[in-house]
Amino acid sequence: KTESSSVQGVIIESVENIANVLKRGKKIYAAAFNGLAQQDLDALKKNKKQIIKLSDEVDELRDNVFYFIKNLDDSSVGASNFYILILGYLQDMTQSLTYITKVSHKHVHNNHKKLKFNQIKELSQINDSIQQLFSEAIDTFSSQSFERIGSIIEQKSKIYAILKSNIETQVQRTRTEESSPKNTTLYFSLLLETKDLLNATTGLLEEYHTEY
């Protein structure tokens, strides 16, 4: 029997895995944005390898869920529910990061038009917000200061507002000045997938916040 026979046990044992996924996810998101802004195909290619590796590791955790549940005692059904929900959020996060990484790589690989200055500026603002949220989440998990989660989750609505505003701006741009369908598609894809990444990350945090 592992220590993980209670929800508290799962929280303690999973902290390292979560901090690891957050650290690498933060880097992968930044690398996708920077590679796209600088049209750096090599960097985007390397980033693609990183997310494949991370996805495989999260999949491996999911593949071991059978043994995790078998290992629990009868009083610990809550722990398995918690663990399965956490795995779901981790998978959602890696799926969003995979999509962001792949579309960024594909856009540059296929020599499509570079994103416009304003688009890069707007994405830079989002990247900064995501980096800040991830940094605070990493600190929280590394130090097990789960009482700080509430204030991190509050950042979600601020980032949502930025995403919404950028979507509206791009709609306006597309109607008046944008000449590249590929650019428009890429830009909307990045915004929407960032929203999904944000939902998965804050969902994960909320789960810990509730249980802790």
Regions found by a protein language model. Give the residues of each.
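Cytosolic, long alpha-helical scaffolding segments
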Residues: 1-212
